[in-house]
Amino acid sequence: MNIFIVVLLCLTGVAIAEQCGRQAGGKLCPNNLCCSQWGWCGSTDEYCSPDHNCQSNCKDSGEGVGGGSASNVLATYHLYNSQDHGWDLNAASAYCSTWDANKPYSWRSKYGWTAFCGPVGAHGQSSCGKCLSVTNTGTGAKTTVRIVDQCSNGGLDLDVNVFRQLDTDGKGYERGHITVNYQFVDCGDSFNPLFSVMKSSVIN
């Protein structure tokens, strides 16, 4: 009987150590293991495939654009109302204003804004200005947003206008949140002089 209890306690300890994702407060798996939809760490397709609702360190992590992806993440909304403030990061008291407030208007207004504290990706200053492709898992509505702030909900805190754009069935507004998948994507901010020259010669 004592051996059974010891084995049971050992198995329970191992299981608890492997919990991750929203079931464990946004915790990531050790050793870059994937976090399954059920909140357990592993390395097979059952854990790592977005088709199986992998939560973090998923196989299509998109590391090439510097951040990764996560599934089934909580997204709330925040009243930045950036268009009412001239897309001014200082007026919105956004965390990233320290580094990005002097970016051109075209850069600041290119995408809707979000605060970021998701389970996968850099946080703090290194996340500022990066872009996410965000998909509402309930409706399939999709948009690209720019990170301008930090949050504490373990996911995203979208500008209310972006939230409305994704909340096409209105259920998110009723609940106060939507469930989303996000992936870091290239913002397309790079200036390519060759492209600009080619574009102007085509116009002329």
From Swiss-Prot:
Transmembrane segments: none annotated. One of its GO terms (molecular function) is chitin binding. Residues 1-17 form the signal peptide. Changing residue 31 to D: Possible deamidation. Proteolytically processed to yield the two chains of the mature protein. N-acetyl-D-glucosamine / N-acetyl-D-neuraminic acid binding lectin. Can inhibit fungal growth. This is Pro-hevein. The lineage of its organism: Eukaryota, Viridiplantae, Streptophyta, Embryophyta, Tracheophyta. The gene is HEV1.
